[in-house]
């Protein structure tokens, strides 16, 4: 399960380390702001120009472009589960699997998708 790094994400890289259970909470806000612009254009360091499955790991391929589906990060399948309307950081925490209301089972930007208005 990934934490918050986007390759060139400034605020979170060092602290995330092994991407364990405590990563989602510890890096939430800073990573969202730091990665938004840089990752939105190309899904982070490992994805090149597309999102077609030639990505390295979920830690190097964490952001979706507009219209870019979750095939970009295999370990994010079932988390964001599809295309996002805006570039976001995919939250791949186990706690999100219990989210089954509103717009679906998944989460974006470190929050579980249990609302009518949702990015996924």
UniProtKB/Swiss-Prot annotation:
GO-annotated cellular components: intermediate filament
Disulfide bridge positions per record: none
Key words of the record: Keratin, Repeat
Positions of region (19 X 2 AA repeats of CG): 4-104
Function: In the hair cortex, hair keratin intermediate filaments are embedded in an interfilamentous matrix, consisting of hair keratin-associated proteins (KRTAP), which are essential for the formation of a rigid and resistant hair shaft through their extensive disulfide bond cross-linking with abundant cysteine residues of hair keratins. The matrix proteins include the high-sulfur and high-glycine-tyrosine keratins.
Additional record remark: Human have a similar number of genes as other primates despite the relative hairlessness of humans.
Family: Belongs to the KRTAP type 28 family.
Name of the protein this chain belongs to: Small cysteine and glycine repeat-containing protein 2
Gene name, Swiss-Prot/TrEMBL: SCYGR2
């Amino acid at each position: 399960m990934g934490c918050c790094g986007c390759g060139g994400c400034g605020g979170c890289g060092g602290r995330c380390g092994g991407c364990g259970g405590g990563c989602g909470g510890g890096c939430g806000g800073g990573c969202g702001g730091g990665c938004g612009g840089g990752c939105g254009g190309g899904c982070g360091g490992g994805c090149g120009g597309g999102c077609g499955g030639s990505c390295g790991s979920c830690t190097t391929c964490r952001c979706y472009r507009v219209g870019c589906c979750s095939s970009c990060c295999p370990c994010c399948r079932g988390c964001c589960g599809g295309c996002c309307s805006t570039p976001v950081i995919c939250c791949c925490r186990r706690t999100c699997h219990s989210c089954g209301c509103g717009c679906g089972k998944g989460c974006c930007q470190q929050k579980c998708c249990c609302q009518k208005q949702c990015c996924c």
